[in-house]
Amino acid sequence: DPARNTEADLVLMESTYGNRLHRDREATVREMESIIQDADHRRGNVLIPAFAVGRTQEILHLLATHYAEWNLARWKVFLDSPMAIRTSQIYWDTPELHDAGGMPRLPNLVLSESAEDSQAINRLRSGALIIAGSGMCEGGRIVHHLKHNLWRPECDVIIVGYQANGTLGRQLVDGNTYVRIHQENIRVRARIHTVGGLSAHGDQDDLVRWYGSF
């Protein structure tokens, strides 16, 4: 949480979500659990497009915290983003700088450093939970995973961040039945889930609480 100040000569603040409230955190956690449990029963893969800095670490923390409860030992969790791997390593190496002892590490986490590591993931037909960038699906390794999994009805895509107009991620959120990836039309048969409550921006209550301390 941001530190609170009581004095300032001038306050400049962002207000991206100043006119709305985020979804309840517990509701978000329950929805994530439900999606993953259902995906396990259907024997598919789960794709999570995520920003490399911040959002990925929040997802990893969430999965590690609920590792036993969600029966995640049945999955292989792939972190397929060189930048996200480097950023996450900082979290793991500096637990003393974080609340509650830092970010726990998933025992079944696989770090996919190279392009060859990333390509090998797409040989898995089930049991792969893949976290990769970019967060809006406009580039990065997630695009390849989408190409290999979107057409499969047993697979799931969990959208955990804002998707700007015109992006591939936004097309998925909007329910497009076909998307264009690498000059190919890919049918969208996977289930697309939009999970709120994980925004890095404070909502109206957060902003009022923060500036109310002055």
Regions found by a protein language model. Give the residues of each.
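Short, conserved secondary-structure transition motifs
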Residues: 54-55, 76-92
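Short helix/loop capping segments that flank catalytic or ligand/cofactor-binding pockets
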Residues: 20-23, 57-59, 87-89, 139-141, ...
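His/Asp/Glu-rich metal-coordinating catalytic cores
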Residues: 1-58, 62-76
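Polar, glycine-rich mid-to-C-terminal structural blocks
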Residues: 101-102
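C-terminal regulatory/interaction regions
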Residues: 65-68, 107-214
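Fold-independent oxyanion-binding glycine-rich loops
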Residues: 13-17, 50-51, 80-82, 133-135, ...
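Short secondary-structure boundary/capping segments
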Residues: 27-28, 63-67, 92-97, 172-176
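Short, surface-exposed amphipathic charged segments that create phosphate/polyanion-binding patches used
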Residues: 90-98, 207-210
